[in-house]
Amino acid sequence: MSLIATVFSRLRQQNKKALIPFITAGDPDPTMTVPLMHELVQAGADIIELGVPFSDPMADGPTIQRSSERALKHHVGLKDVLAMVAEFRTSNMSTPVVLMGYANPVEAMGYAKFAAKAKECGVDGVLTVDYPPEECAEWVEHLRQQKLDAIFLLSPTTPQARIEQVAEMAQGYVYYVSLKGVTGASHLDLGEVASKLDQLRSHISIPIGVGFGIRDGATAKAVAGLADAVVVGSRIIEEIEKSPKTKVLASVGRLVKDLRSAIDEVSSKH
């Protein structure tokens, strides 16, 4: 069983839902990434999604685009991100880390080399935003050889055939993007999310995390009542962006603790 599957199994036994925060590696600067990862865990994160900076992050809204730009100013690339995970692993072996990014840096490194290096550094899963399931059998095979979970995005507009392909290929969890468009948008329709999750669960047996549009405890709590995991990215990046460097850890820690408390309120009632 993968570390991600182990975490979800433990949470199920505890009647809890997973909190999965996202940060971009190298934002606000490379020295802050590993301390931020530890802060996320102390504040209640179950799994960390770590973004690999990319110059053309087409699926991301302006907040996460800016975080990528800040990291790229410090020349943070895929090798640096893997080194950050390795550093995190020197003192945390139990919190899964999922790399989230785009295909280009992975292709530049090569599938086999990337998968081997990611495993060696302590990565648990990989979500490549711009790899549709129908085009990435070879990529997924390289991940599986290294016992890395291949994680996929689904959205309100994903066609049925692709949902079925994801159901066959995905491991760890599936990330359901609850809004059309780019990250950081608002206006989450919980009724629509509930109905879509019911549909997805008729095909997908692994946990489903919901993200995009979760900006506060109330929304996190509502989503936790529907999904297996709550994914929060843009709201955390905003906190990093607006806080002075000396206050970033405390500000992010406060936000994540609030989200954790809200999620646990609903989980404990089930």
Language-model features, listed with the residues they occupy:
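Active-site-adjacent beta->alpha loops and helix N-cap segments on the catalytic face
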Residues: M1-L11, P30, S55-R66, K73-F88, ...
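Glycine-rich phosphate-binding active-site loops on the catalytic face of alpha/beta enzymes
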Residues: A45-D56, V123-L127, P132, V174-G184, ...
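Catalytic cores of alpha/beta
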Residues: P30-L40, T158-E168, V210, I214-V230
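Active-site mouth loops of central-metabolism enzymes
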Residues: L19-T33, V98-G110, D149-T158
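Short beta-strand/loop segments at the ligand-binding rim of alpha/beta enzyme cores
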Residues: Q14-I20, N92-Y102, L143-L153, R201-G211
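Alpha/beta catalytic cores of nucleotide-metabolism and tRNA/nucleoside-modifying enzymes
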Residues: D198-S205, R215-H270
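Conserved, mostly hydrophobic/aromatic
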Residues: P21, L40, G51, A118, ...
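Structural motif
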Residues: A43, C121, M169, H203, ...
